[in-house]
Amino acid sequence: MTAPEIGCAEAIPLSKSQQNLYNGVLQDNDPALYLIGKRYRFHPLALSNFLAALEASVLNNPVQLCVLQMAATDADYPQLVPRLQFSDLVLVRSAAQGQPDGPGADLEHTWSSGILDRPLVRYTVSTDEGGNVCGLDVHTHHILLDGGATGIIEADLAHFLAASLEPAGVGQMPTLSQGLAKLAAAHLRETAKVAEALRRQADAVQRELTAEAGQGGGAQGASGTSGAAAKGVLQESIALCGPAYDALRALSEAQQVPLNVLVAAAAVAVQAGLRQSTESLLVHAVDNRFGDPELNVATCLVNSVAHALRFRPFASVREVVRDLDRGYVKAVRRRWIREEHYRRMYLAINRTSHVQALTLNFIRESCAPGLRPFLSEAPVATEIGPIEGTTVACVLDEQRHTLNLAIWDRADLPERNTGAGVAARIGAALESMAALWDQPIAMTANEWFEVGADGLPCRTEAAGRPRPPSAPAWFVDAAPGLRQFLDRRRHVYPWVGWLVCHGVVPGDVLVCTDDDTDKTVDLLLACHLAGCGYSMCESVDDLSLRATTIGEHCEGSSAHPVDVAAVRLGAVPDHALRERIDQRLDQVARDPLLATKAAYIMPTSGTTGQPKLVRISHGSLAAFCAAIGPSYGWNSRDTILQCAPLTSDISVEEIFGAAVCGAELVRSAAMKTGDLGGLARDIHALGPTVVDLPTAVWHLLCEDGDAVDVIGRSRLRQIVIGGESIRTSTVDKWVNSPVLAPISLVSSYGPTEATVVATHLPIVYDGIAAAAHTRLRVGLPMAPNTVFIAFGEVVIAGPLVSDGYLGIDDSSFGAVAPGDGSQLRAFATADRVTIDEEGFPVFAGRKDTIVKVAGKRVDTAAVARRISADPTVCDVAVEPHDGRLGVWFETERTREAAEDGATAGRIGLTLASLGVPAFFVVAVPSIPRKPNGKVDGARLHTLPQLADAVPSDAEAGESAAGLARVWSRHLGRPLAADSSLLGAGIGSLDLIRILPDTRRYLGRHLSVLELISADTAANLVCDLGSNPAAPATDGWLDAETAAAIERDLVSLGSQCTPQPLGAKPPPHDRAAAPIVVLGASGIVGTGFARAVLERKQAGLACPEIVLASRSKPPEHGPWSALRGLEGIRIEQLGATLGAADLDALICDTGARSLINCIGNTNVLVPYRGLRAANVELVSTVAQVCAQRDVRLVHLSTFVISADVTAPRVTDPRMSPYPYAASKSLAELIVAASSPALDFTIVRLPRVLGEDYQLRESADILVSVVDACMALRAFPTLTLTEEVTTGRAAAQAILGLLPQFSGAAGLGHGITVVRGAAVQYRELLSGYALDEIDAAEWKHRLDQSDWARRNPQRWSVVDAWVSLGMRLGARSYSQYLAGYPSIPLQVGTVAEIAAPPTALRALLEQGCAQPPRPALA
């Protein structure tokens, strides 16, 4: 081939898609992240013909011959410049050779120091034994090509392959200049289309997102997902074919729904089951070339469109498919709005930097049709580049009647359970859709359960079961005790007469207030007997509005305000009135529509928002009342205390429950006034046997010693509580009290929308308490076949469910189909559940208690539960306030108006461990509550203690204005504190550029996603509001990470039950037994390789050394000399290293000592990216070594403790950054291992590797020296750090092992390796550099070419400077001293010396950038 005419080729600007990807490259450190790969297997083809066709296809798509080069001017982005030949892209090898690291590994290595001036595509051609082509692996950087471009190249390759079989062969090669001209034109057109879309559609999209955010729509924040991309790895795949494929096609045609939408619906259902949430953000990959021939060019033009989807947990398949289809069509209409712009709007409007999205990539053909005849099997995607979350890749093969589903996920996630079967579950959901089209979509994902009579969930074949008709009202066909109950109520029948005389007809509604006497209760009873309903108001001022509302929205009903106190009732109705009363009672009992008429209209509690009026029918109330006696055991010998406000639905249970059971009913007004002492006295004086209380009130009573004493002397036999979670500690206090234990306790649950109570759970019975872990269970249904669980949310269906809110159309209400053609009313409660170890559902908070705090989602219910677990806390309230989370708490000390700083401090630490980004803690004498037991939020926010706890707005405003000035200077345009970065047109690259100055100004390390989500200086200052109660964790410790660390702290430290071992290793003298160095290819591992080589070369005694690593050792450094050396084994491990693999290695080698050098040292990645190597593997290694009686040398680091000689580690829940947390956990795991394990934990200072390792590393010391030499200046700083080399550390550590030292063992202790103390200022001044202010140095660095050429090293230096800002004048040890620590159960702590040699020369070698050879 003739090389391109370099001098004639013009540089081509990047497309908008490529610019976005380049922004990502600048932020990410993994060269493999953007690798795209596809594998083809061919029928045998002549190599010469194949290469000729491949060369022609490359020339026809010349973007592949381009490299990225920065323009001579100070441009934002590099340009595409043709500088390569075909031979630079192609590698031919025999298929028998194989490549241990994969065919794309060499390309990844090429990109390790950056992607500028590097080939971005590699064709690896495989040949069979006969020399014919049998396979092709294509790897490219995503910035060069997308999926559509791959299809174009495939079509060209097919064309030229077909031509190569003709006598004339491929013929004239395509002209390079024409291809480059088409490429440039396509990029210009794409840029124009994007600009036009922004001009025409951006405002509409912003309004749409704002509306969705206001309605609570959109995806949940992925507290565990940083928003940064990670390498995608294939998890699993399946193929739908044969009858399953045909049935799916038939469904698509019958319902007129595209196949990709059906797949999306199935994926959404399965994902909803996995996440236990019905809110999703769906992202669809789109190829904008469609329909535009000018864009039909091989390059990267990829875009994605996103749309939010929120569906009811009981929604049918039909409903979800319909909504998803509409959302997809709407999203595709704005396909030219760039995904990164849409994301910026989404993050800014939703004030979050974390988005959990499901990506769907539906590909309508596995390859270009013309290529199929040459292929022996369908091509396979081997690498898909960066992804942010679960990605469902679906490939349609119409020719083979097959639909292939593949699940890809982030490589940095913990190892997935092999039984996850996500692809299989999606396939099963697709197969079941036709039969379940009108059933809940939860059933397709096996997420629909009915809670049975025993409280256990079970799957059902239909959404519900039709119930036999029940009584139309609670007083129709009632038990004999009802008559006696009514006869005891002296005002009931006079009230019925009054209603008759005043023209109140059946179906009307009485609106009134409570006069705190039996007279009002009797009116409510009389209303029902007369076929009417009632609605209670808090005050007389509310009567008129309530009556008007009911009149407007209750068709066929009239509302009648009544002044109860003013009505004068006769003692006994006369004969004529009695006849009219009897006629009315008979008329009502015979009314065929009685069950549908309103029994009461009651406001919701308002706990989760503005109270809404709920209409409950007589039929619903009758179904509930019929369940009270069997569920609670109430009977005619009971006396029920009516103490709840009549505006609360607890009063419904008290009044009508007593009526149907024939019990006595007595009243107390103490609850209404909040007089708990008075309530206790009434319980004693009035003699009730049963009382119904809000859980919060019961908690407070239990904390009141006087009240407990009074209640203990009463006739009480049962308390029914409900309204919020029960505290286990309070239950224990109850059963441990001799006077309270005999009183049974029943916890009830139910929303106002489903007639008072749906389930009940016995907590204390006969003085015995239910086990602690069972006390938050959902419980037993009041009525059979009414309680369901769908996607982790409680759904109530059947007669208990109301028709909905008065005058409000709410999606929580709907209907499900039992399968017999009928419909059952359904209500989605928003109450979340999990399943405990015994299979019972357990309450896990509410969906609507999740609030946004500083852009992050916080579950206030979970926070309240954690704080309530503190035994000193009597009461607590948790609510958002001015962008922060407020916690008001009450203890015995605060009740006496005393300070309780200890409790406040513990609460602050709890909030920090839960990842709450901004909060304040307020100690109060008492938590204000409403009569129904709910927290009175209005009074809470006016408590005088709040002013002292919350910082003033003036300081925050000044800080925001200062930050806006910093941005204005940097961007060259005026910005105010409330100016939107998005609205001002600040691009992604500009955001990356202002990030360093923003970090410096705020003194905090933050990500570009946090900057995007804040969008204004004012928001950002508010989001990063300080939490003085706890050490800052730099924003990395989100709720999910905190939970993961908590789990690891509890579970990984305790060794699992040993698994059965295989054959024992061959016997060895322990003093001369082999040593395994695990992770030998890393910096310290290579140090061991160098140290062992030098011992061998010096003729010193050395036991057999096994150098084991997952990656292939390089061909330079000590490795080439070690190969074939006697007593040295080099073992390459598999990609995953489990207990069985490690056990096999030990058995095979006969090792008696193991040095664990494996570890992820990247200080920039999140905890989940470190966990596998730094935590999980450490646990595995410790267990296997203990089981095999193998000594363990565990390598650790200085960053885990303020004092490296102390047997303590910083509490990983409070560590300053993820890497430190993971290393602290690792030490805790080793120290807590089996007593049989002989170990030492070796704490290392900074360790430098071989020269070739340093040249490719992003070590902070090397990076700082490199940056200083590039700038010819170093920052003024006083920093001293211990440093050693891998070789020196290895030599010192080997001396610890009995094979070298002759000692009996390692000693179950800690060994501190001491290096040389390096003063940064002294070191850097030795390079003849200028010393300048640190801020000025960092500013120069951020603007430098070095920063653009070395994004990885710049990121590390940037994080280092950010940490320095947090340290201030303190050393790192002094900084860590402010963090809580955990002691290690170890023996002695010893120190060994490992001084490095020629440190300055080594650093210079690491910084030296040899000239890159010019590319032809």
Curated annotation (Swiss-Prot):
GO molecular function terms listed in the Swiss-Prot or TrEMBL record: ATP binding; ligase activity; phosphopantetheine binding; transferase activity
GO CC terms, sorted: cytosol
Gene Ontology terms describing biological process: amino acid activation for nonribosomal peptide biosynthetic process; secondary metabolite biosynthetic process
Domain of life: Bacteria
EC id: 2.3.1.-, 6.2.1.-
Disrupted-gene phenotype: Deletion of the gene cluster mmaABCDE causes a significant decrease in the intracellular accumulation of zinc in Sauton's medium where metal concentrations are relatively low.
One Pfam family named in its UniProt record: Epimerase
Required cofactor(s): pantetheine 4'-phosphate
Catalytic reactions of this protein: 2 a (3R)-3-isocyanyl-fatty acyl-[ACP] + L-lysine + ATP + 2 NADPH = an isonitrile lipopeptide + 2 holo-[ACP] + AMP + diphosphate + 2 NADP(+)
Domain note: Contains 4 domains: a C (condensation) domain, an A (adenylation) domain, a T (thiolation) domain, and an R (reduction) domain. The T domain acts as a lyine-specific peptidyl-carrier protein, and carries a lyine residue that is transferred to it by the A domain. The C domain catalyzes the condensation of two isonitrile-containing moieties to both amino groups of the lysine bound to the T domain, a rare activity in nonribosomal peptide biosynthesis. Finally, the R domain catalyzes a four-electron thioester reduction, releasing the product from the NRPS and forming a terminal alcohol product.
Protein family according to the UniProt entry: Belongs to the ATP-dependent AMP-binding enzyme family.
Designated name of the protein: Isonitrile lipopeptide synthase
Annotated organism of origin: Mycobacterium marinum (strain ATCC BAA-535 / M)
Source lineage: Bacteria, Bacillati, Actinomycetota, Actinomycetes, Mycobacteriales
Gene giving rise to this polypeptide: mmaA
